Amino acid sequence: MSLGAKIAVSAMRGIKKTGLIKGLSADLDAELRKAKKYNRKHPYARLCESQNRGVKAVKILIFGAGVIGSLYGALLAEAGYNVSVYARGRRLESLTQDGLLYKRKGKIRRASVNILSRLEAKDCYDLILLTVRENQLHAALEELRQNVSPTIVTMVNSLETYDRWEAICGVGRIIPAFPGAGGGFDGNVLDAALTPRLIQPTTFGKTGGRERALARVLHQAKIPCQIVPDMRAWQLCHLAMVVPIADAYYEAADPEHAGRDTALMRKTAKQIRDNLEAIAARKIRLSPGKMQAFRLLTTPLVGWILGFVFQSSFGDRFMYRHSMKAPDEMLRLHEQFYRWLEKKAI
């Protein structure tokens, strides 16, 4: 076994013994075996070692400097992590000139991050948060194929299977996730926030133990998160809800005030319910469990609730802004989701 693999195994055994990251047990043992098998330092060991040295030792790359990437980058930098942001085009120009500006508690702050215009194959990060739109995902994964960083957290709304992504960037690198955040830009200043913990924390799936190391990073930055047993099921249920919500904005005569249209809200409620019923009929467990409410409550009641949410500041920040900013992405997701339902019905 090479020196690198021996160091990885030794470090991970020490972490298990001291309880640095709780609850690893069988998952950690499996990772140790992988480190031996592949005769190299395992990505899980690398992240754990960096965490053991302190937050400044953990290198994080934000790949995609839109609303989501900028917010996570700012919050992680606030927590002391070594954060770099990879951007292009006008966003790169803005970041290079002014830095990553964001609103926080009524004040404008500048995040302590490194701004990158290119990513070299040898540039190694403990975590890469991939925060691009669904229709940009494949190109981003292609670019990351040659990079040596071991772990890519895909914070993307998509219906594709994760093995398809790993076929592009490399097996064992993906942690499938979804952000719990929303907002927009006021000029070049980020005006965004995390979604409330009870509604939708940052969510990611189980990946043999690495997800717990990721959770520790987010907890350190006070970013609420949850680990779900079946991320694929979670994303299907999420699409079952957000696709009809986006459709409602596009169908409304006055999208900004779509929540005032009672008939449209009831139609949206019925479509969400039908979508979740179709998923459940395919023996897929609804995730999170609160999705069951759409099936149990009456359509008029759910429609009334949706109308209230659409007209709230929450709806404006976390629903309206994204739907109106990314209609091409939402149309693609609409087509993918209903094509999947039709295919599964055959």
Regions from the language model: what does each represent?
Residues 163-238, 244:
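Rossmann-fold dinucleotide-binding core
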Residues 56-108:
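NAD(P)+-binding Rossmann beta1-loop-alpha1 motif at the extreme N-terminus of oxidoreductases
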Residues 277-346:
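NAD(P)-dependent Rossmann-like dehydrogenase/reductase catalytic/cofactor-binding core
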Residues 232-276:
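Active-site-proximal catalytic alpha-helix in oxidoreductases
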Residues 6, 16-17, 34-36, 51:
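Charged/polar low-complexity intrinsically disordered segments
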Residues 60, 83, 152, 174, ...:
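Hydrophobic anchor at the start of a short beta-strand
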Residues 107-190:
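Rossmann-like NAD(P)(H) cofactor-binding subdomain of soluble oxidoreductases
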